[in-house]
């Protein structure tokens, strides 16, 4: 059967053939994420995945959805679209592992003013790379043209993931107590939160060329390159730790920084006590604080400050947890603080 084509629809701004071309170009990337649990191919009405319950007494599915926010604006100005998909996957899978779950499948949604097949395929290339890093399958997606609603050269990107965890292994902070140790897993940079403030600080909307500047603090990188560093995906090292260590809490440090996200994994009447001098903050954050005149409190209440994820473990297992992290892709993981009596986050 010939591919359908509607001259009337194309005249209204939706090119069906561009959609077909996008799918053909992205197939090679999607194929990298497929595994023995995937049933059927690309193009069906739904993504099929055969759940293997071997090893699970009572499997529980956990889902998460997120987007990349206005980091997309930086990608559009830089005309670099092949890593922003990693951010999309990271924002979703890093959330579900906070419950101790292994991500299984991922789906993406792209809305655009005009479907440029090469650009769409590049975006999906990044999504597929993120799925490979997270060891989950890209089983479906949607690309929607929105003529008249979005400028032709703009797009939005969001994703959705489903993971699985044994019910008895869902992370609980019930045994969290004073003396437990908080471990930091470093970020690659700003990740995917706080970009509305980043854009304001550097006046990016009015002066997009600033993204091509090379501030001395960034060691030869352009500002745009530093800001587009993909969000780190912590799935594999964290799952390794969960196999051998009693993890009492995990927080993905996203919008709201330390003050909003660390308390989400704390037991009532427990406080995260962190010495600010122990936080290994990259130069990019110091540059933003200086240029924007941002208070230290607002920095820690907006950005990850170089810490993308924190794990709370018993003091006697902290060294073992670090050893596992160091051997599984997190060589720079370190002790960040301790649990004390109280509530919230205490930065001293």
Report each predicted region and the residues it spans.
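Residue-level signature of catalytic and energy-coupling elements of molecular machines
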Residues: 15, 66, 179, 252, ...
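Short loop/turn motifs at secondary-structure junctions
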Residues: 100-102, 197, 246, 332
């Amino acid at each position: 059967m010939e591919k359908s084509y509607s001259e009337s629809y194309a005249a209204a701004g939706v090119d069906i053939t561009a959609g077909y071309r996008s799918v053909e170009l992205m197939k090679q990337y999607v194929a990298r994420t497929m595994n023995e649990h995937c049933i059927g191919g690309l193009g069906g009405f739904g993504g099929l995945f055969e759940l293997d319950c071997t090893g699970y007494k009572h499997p529980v599915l956990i889902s998460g959805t997120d987007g990349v926010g206005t980091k997309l604006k930086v990608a559009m100005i830089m005309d670099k679209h092949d890593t922003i998909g990693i951010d999309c996957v990271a924002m979703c899978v890093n959330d579900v592992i906070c419950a101790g779950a292994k991500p299984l499948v991922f789906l993406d949604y792209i809305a655009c003013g005009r479907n440029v097949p090469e650009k769409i395929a590049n975006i999906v290339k990044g999504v597929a790379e993120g799925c490979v890093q997270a060891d989950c399958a890209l089983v479906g997606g949607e690309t929607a043209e929105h003529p008249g609603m979005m400028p032709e050269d703009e797009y939005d990107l969001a994703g959705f993931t489903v993971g699985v965890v044994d019910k008895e292994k869902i992370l609980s902070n019930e045994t969290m107590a004073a003396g437990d140790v908080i471990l930091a897993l470093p970020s690659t940079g700003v990740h995917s939160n706080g970009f509305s403030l980043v854009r304001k600080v550097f006046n990016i909307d009015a002066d997009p060329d600033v993204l091509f500047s090379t501030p001395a603090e960034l060691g030869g990188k352009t500002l745009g390159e530093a800001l587009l560093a993909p969000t780190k995906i912590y799935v594999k090292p964290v799952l390794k730790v969960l196999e051998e260590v009693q993890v009492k809490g995990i927080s993905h440090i996203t919008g709201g920084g330390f003050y909003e996200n660390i308390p989400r994994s704390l037991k009532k009447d427990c406080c995260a006590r962190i010495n600010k001098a122990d936080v290994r903050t990259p130069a990019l954050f110091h540059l933003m604080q200086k240029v924007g005149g941002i208070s230290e409190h607002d920095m820690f209440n907006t950005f990850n400050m170089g810490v993308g994820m924190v794990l709370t473990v018993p003091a006697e297992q902290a060294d073992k947890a670090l050893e596992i992290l160091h051997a599984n892709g997190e060589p720079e993981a370190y002790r960040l603080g301790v649990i004390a009596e109280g509530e919230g986050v205490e930065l001293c």
